Amino acid sequence: MKKIAFHIQKGGVGKTTLSGNIASYLSKTKKVILVDCDIQQASSSTWFLNHEILKLDIKDFLLKKMDVDQVVRQIQKNFYILPCVPSGTFRRDVQHELQDFPYLIDDFCLELEKLGFEFAIFDLSPSFELWERRIILAMCEVITPLTPEFLSLEGINIFKEEFESLLKSYRKKVKHEKIICNMLNKSFKRHNLHLRQFKTFGYDLYEVGQDAKIAESQLYKKSIFDYYPESRSVLELSRLGDALCL
């Protein structure tokens, strides 16, 4: 099972939108689960109706030791989600558990693999505490979304330093080869300037433009591939999804 996390310590860059759309794309040919690891439940809210009550979520598996198949919810064929319900004590409780059981996330991923999942896509919060660090250490690859803004230049450098330090400390290998320039508008001079800078970083770069259809698709609880397959964003998102299958 391939384990992919979308992460950077900055909000508003489109981690949730990108992770959900990539998970949806991969589910056309693979069995995929989207794991909502953000206590703001962004992914869970994106894929479920506002009035729908999610009684069980990721903490019921991690903390209450419920079977993972009782917690996952199916969105469509081959596409599942492990939701997260807001809780004021979730981060504290799960980080306490991780101190006692440092391989909790690794064991969790093994349980997902037993259910036949071929991809697990993790949507992380813009933090870098024990919760996020343990998830990253269990991944095959981390993908960093950026927006074409000045602060993104500093953000990717900070993340790279902390990411490399984390891997060195635990002697782990996790790929970090792909970045996404998200919400790009090439009619803006500053966006083109930052895009050129992103191209010098040495990563595989994916360019996803500003797209009102992506925002609209969330209103209908659909991916851009199902809501508006003619979208300008589909080609580059598909290219990223195909690269993850290699």
Swiss-Prot record:
Q: Which SUPFAM superfamilies match?
A: P-loop containing nucleoside triphosphate hydrolases (SSF52540)
Q: Which domain of life is it from?
A: Bacteria
Transmembrane as a keyword?
no
Q: Which InterPro entries match?
A: AAA_dom (IPR025669), DNA_Partitioning_ATPase (IPR050678), P-loop_NTPase (IPR027417)
Q: Has the keyword Cell membrane been applied to this entry? A: no
Q: Which UniProt keywords apply?
A: Plasmid
Q: Which Pfam families match?
A: AAA_31
PANTHER family in the cross-refs: COBYRINIC ACID AC-DIAMIDE SYNTHASE (PTHR13696:SF99), P-LOOP CONTAINING NUCLEOSIDE TRIPHOSPHATE HYDROLASE (PTHR13696)
What is the protein named? Uncharacterized protein BBD21
